[in-house]
Amino acid sequence: ALPILVRIGGSGLSLADHYRAGQLIARAAGRLGRRTVIVASGDLSHKLKEEGPYGFCAQGPEYDKRIMDVMGEARFGELLEFTEGFCEKAGECGHRSFTMMAGAMDGMAVKPRRLSYEGPFGVGYGICTFEVQGEDKSRFFLRAYQELEQEQCRKKQEKEDAYVSLARKSLEHYVHTRRMIPMQAVGGNLPDEMLRSRAGVFVSIHKNGALRGCIGTISPVCGNVAEEIIQNAVSAGIHDPRFPSVREDELQQLVYSVDVLGETSPIKGPEELDVKRYGVIVSKGRKRGLLLPNLDGVDTVEQQIGIARQKAGIGPDEKGVSLERFEVIRHGDKG
């Protein structure tokens, strides 16, 4: 019989989800009772050399060395530990394919062979093979990763202040009941500053180190900061158009941060910005875009303004744009 070729593409889902997809592939192959070969295709870093097509980034060679070490020794659990930010800076395009293949060999003893690595033109290429040798109960890597992740989330929850705790409780209550958490259920446990002051608030949600939702208000629209957090936590988890609504089975994996915005002030130009200290608001007519300060992957003022322009729908070369800056008090961390 002729071999059957099944092509499966990657996605923007998490590394854990791709590993899980690999497990499902293995389950399907097992039910068919056929010999199966899995090919995980994709380049390594595209940022190995200045003269290469995508330039140089320090994370490029670091990624290639790390991925070849991991794959060369079949340490598949470590594939799940690569952060989204690191992979993005490295400019790789194969990591999710590799992770899916690894998932298909979860719980299996594997004989790895590292055949080659090269990157002569600024893009990394590696070849490894893996031969399944039978079962190995010490190699259920996704289960171990999820247990570690849950423990880390639990420790973060223990350290949450009132702002972050309220954001978490607000979204969890909504996901469970489809109703907003009533103020009388939480107000007695909140510090006075959350009940007496008004400010714009952004709530950010991360999962596996990647953004899962972020919604906020530039100026206050609720009676106090606590109400602002409740509204924006639910909006970030349910109504951010970039992501599907948070599911109940995700709640224990989420990490929250709350940014309370200070007063905005107009500035003359980019020279008055600092990406670590100040957020920026870019405006033209009715178009307005905001970007918070001190975000992973935003390292220059030019990047910061460019992203804010994009969010506002203002072209990169459009004139007549006004800039404002603001500071925030950040509660929690960004994943």
Short names for language-model regions:
Residues A1-L24, R31, E50-S165, S245-D249, ...:
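Flexible, D/E/H-enriched segments
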Residues I8, R34-G42:
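Beta-strand elements within well-structured catalytic alpha/beta cores of enzymes
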